[in-house]
Amino acid sequence: MDAPGVPQPTIGQFCAKVCGWVRFWPDHDAITAELTAHLEDHRDVLLERNPALSQAEAEAQAVAAMGDPEALGRELDKSHNHL
């Protein structure tokens, strides 16, 4: 868990971190689009369930729920390659 007061990355920053671990760069746009869709859907559900949340808070929670961007990127790198 992140330390209190440490800002969570935005959806775009999270996707960029994930793609930083995927060597086959032609797939970066597709990976970013899919991750963004999942994160935006999760954010929107959080906002529906808790209207008191700000958009930024809901986005931060959605990003945090995705876990470690390095670990995710390394796993995606295994399936997104040119060979």
Residue locations for each model-derived region?
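A short, ordered amphipathic alpha-helix with a cationic face
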Residues: D2-Q8, A30-T36, L47
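Short, charge-enriched, intrinsically disordered boundary segments that mark the beginning
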Residues: M1-V22
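Short, well-structured alpha-helical segments
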Residues: G12, D29-T36, E40, E59-V63
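Cytosolic juxtamembrane regions of integral membrane proteins
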Residues: M1-P4, V45, R49-L83
